[in-house]
Regions:
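Contiguous, often N-terminal, cationic amphipathic patches that form binding interfaces
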Residues: 1-77, 81, 86, 98, ...
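Glycine-rich active-site/cofactor-binding loop and its immediate structural neighborhood
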Residues: 93
Length: 116
């Protein structure tokens, strides 16, 4: 739960909402096939459905009120992973801040798989 203090009171935004915004920002970037989830039982990476994107996003709120975001993605073959990662970081920072007012400490992108 992300908490934002304003002059009028406190705003609480669920991790699911932040994850949905983050996942939508990431998957809108060219070359991203989808969000990824690594199964603990078999160790395989799974492509997540759009309704389950939050499993591929990890959000940490720090004591200072800012947040760190980790994204696990699957990309299409033949794309420049560095360029995709930079675009994702830019999109996520912009959209999360625009929609929630959250201060972003860091956005880390993990390319877990390449799929056709």
């Amino acid at each position: 739960m992300f908490k934002l203090q304003t002059d009028q009171g406190e705003i609480q935004i669920s991790d699911t909402v932040l994850s949905d915004i983050t996942g939508a920002a990431a998957t809108s970037c060219y070359g991203v096939k989808g969000m990824a989830y690594r199964s603990m039982t078999d160790g395989l990476v799974h492509l997540l459905r759009p309704t389950a994107m939050s499993k591929g996003v990890h959000i940490t709120q720090h004591d200072e009120g800012d947040i760190s975001i980790e994204l696990h993605i699957i990309v299409e073959p033949g794309v420049n992973m560095t360029a995709i990662s930079r675009e994702i970081i830019s999109q996520v920072r912009y959209l999360v801040n625009k929609n929630t007012g959250a201060r972003i400490r860091s956005v880390d992108v993990y390319v877990d798989s390449i799929t056709l």
